[in-house]
Design a protein with these regions (language model features):
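Acidic, proline/glycine-enriched N-terminal capping motif
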Residues: 1-97, 105
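Conserved, structured C-terminal
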Residues: 1-25, 29-40, 112-374
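Internal amphipathic helical hairpin motif
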Residues: 72-106, 161-189
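Short, charge-rich binding segments
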Residues: 58, 80, 88-90, 98-105, ...
Length: 374
C-alpha cells in the first residue's frame, strides 16, 4: 500500500475553528471531508482508541457542516427530505434523518436538530448535500431560506466526558437526555450542547456558533480536563465498527437503501406526508432487499492494515459481496469487519473468503453490533 508522506495546506480546503488547536496538541494526519481538513490521527489508531477509553477526548468534527432550513415551509421541506417522521421530533430534540434519492438510495445521512418550530439544522456527513437541499427546495417551490450557518461541532468523548461537561457547563448536563440539546452562552461563547456523538461511548457534541472562538472553547475544555486524563482524538474506526456505526461513502452510498444496511427502522411508510423515495422504498419493503450489511470476524493475529478500497467477498470462488471496513478490536480481542453480501448469503455463521490484495482471508459472518451503547 502507498503511504501519504505529507499534506499540503492551501486556501482551496477550509480549516475548522479548532485547526490551530489540533496542531498544538499533536495531530499527525488529516483527510479531506466536506471540503475541509479533518484530523484522522494523533498517536495512532489503537493509541487514540485506548486514550479515549481511559479518560476524555476532544474531537474536532467541524467538518460536520450544517444545512439550516428556516422559514414558513421549513418543517414541510425537512419532512420531504427524509423517510423519518420528523413530526415526532420536538424543539430541543435531535434525530438521525438520512436524505434519500428518488430510488431510495442514500444522498447523505445527517443528524437533524429542531432548533425552532420553523428552523432545522442537518449535521452532514461527507458530500455536497447543501446543493441537493437547495435544488429540491427550488424545484418544489418551498418557501424557505437555506444556508450553511456559522456552526462547527466539537465532540467530547469517553467515560469521563460527563464529568468534564458538568465541571465546565454545570449540573444541568446531568439531566440532558439522549439526542436532546440545549442552546447556551458560556463565557460569551454561543453554543448548542447535545447528548450525542459518533460512537457508542458516553459522548456529547458542542455546536460552536462563532468560528472565531474555536481555540478559546478548546482551551476551556482542555484546562478543565487535565485531571480527567484528557487527550485529543478523532472519529475512530475501531469504535465505529465495535458499535455498528455506519460511515457514509465507506459503508453505503446512493447504490444502497436503508433496508440493506439495517436502517429499515427509520423508514415510516405509514405517515401521511410524502417524502423523496417513498414509493421506491414501499416496493423494496414489499419485495425485500437484494443485499445486506453484516459483521464478519477473522481469526488469527491482529490485522494492522486498513483497506483503501472495498475488497471482494467470495464463496466457492464466486463474488457475493464486498468488505467495506476492517480493523482489530483490542477490547474484543478479534479482527472485525463490515461486509455487504447478496441476500441469500447473509445468514449469521456463514463462512466467507475476503480477497485482499495480498492474500485470501477466511472469515465468518455475525450480526451487528458487537457492543451496545453506553
Amino acid at each position: 500500500m502507498y503511504k501519504t508522506s505529507r499534506v499540503v495546506f492551501s486556501p482551496r480546503v477550509r480549516k475548522s475553528p479548532y485547526f490551530n488547536s489540533t496542531l498544538k496538541y499533536g495531530v499527525q494526519a488529516f483527510s479531506v471531508y466536506n471540503h475541509m481538513y479533518m484530523p484522522t490521527s494523533y498517536e495512532g489508531t489503537v493509541e487514540d482508541y485506548q486514550n479515549l477509553l481511559n479518560g476524555v477526548q476532544l474531537w474536532d468534527v467541524g467538518v460536520e457542516r450544517q444545512v439550516q432550513i428556516k422559514g414558513r415551509d421549513a418543517e414541510a421541506l425537512s419532512q420531504f427530505l427524509t423517510p423519518r417522521n420528523i413530526k415526532k421530533c420536538s424543539k430541543g430534540q435531535a434525530m438521525y434523518a438520512p436524505f434519500l434519492d428518488f430510488k431510495g438510495g442514500f444522498i447523505n445521512d445527517p443528524v437533524m436538530l429542531k432548533i425552532e418550530e420553523d428552523c432545522y439544522w442537518f449535521s452532514l456527513a461527507d458530500g455536497d448535500a447543501l446543493l441537493w437541499v437547495q435544488g429540491i427546495a427550488a424545484g418544489y417551490k418551498f418557501d424557505v431560506d437555506i444556508r450553511e450557518p456559522d456552526v462547527s461541532p466539537l465532540q467530547v468523548q469517553g467515560p469521563n466526558s460527563k464529568e468534564l461537561m458538568v465541571k465546565v457547563f454545570g449540573d444541568w448536563i446531568n439531566d440532558l437526555g439522549f439526542y436532546r440539546f440545549k442552546e447556551v452562552t458560556h463565557k460569551s461563547i454561543p453554543i448548542v450542547i447535545g447528548r450525542m456523538g459518533y460512537s457508542r461511548e458516553l459522548c456529547y457534541e458542542i455546536f460552536l456558533q462563532d468560528h472565531s472562538k474555536g481555540d478559546e472553547l478548546w482551551e476551556i475544555l482542555w484546562e478543565a480536563g487535565k485531571d480527567l486524563n484528557i487527550s485529543a482524538g478523532t472519529p475512530n474506526i475501531i469504535l465505529r465498527l465495535e458499535g455498528g456505526i455506519l460511515s457514509y461513502l465507506a459503508d453505503m452510498d446512493r447504490t444502497n437503501n436503508p433496508y440493506e444496511v439495517g436502517l429499515e427502522w427509520m423508514v415510516d411508510l405509514e405517515q401521511e406526508d410524502d417524502f423523496i423515495g417513498k414509493e421506491a422504498l414501499r416496493e423494496i419493503s414489499h419485495s425485500g432487499p437484494t443485499k445486506k450489511l453484516m459483521g464478519a470476524e477473522i481469526a488469527g493475529e491482529p490485522i494492522t492494515v486498513f483497506n483503501e478500497e472495498h475488497w471482494p467477498v467470495l464463496i466457492d470462488n464466486k463474488t457475493i459481496g464486498s468488505m467495506n471496513a476492517l480493523v482489530y478490536s483490542p477490547r474484543l480481542d478479534k479482527n472485525i469487519a463490515y461486509v455487504i453480501l447478496d441476500i441469500k448469503h447473509s445468514k449469521s455463521g456463514q463462512e466467507i473468503v475476503i480477497s485482499s490484495p495480498e492474500k485470501e482471508i477466511l472469515a465468518v459472518t455475525v450480526d451487528l453490533p458487537w457492543l451496545e451503547r453506553v
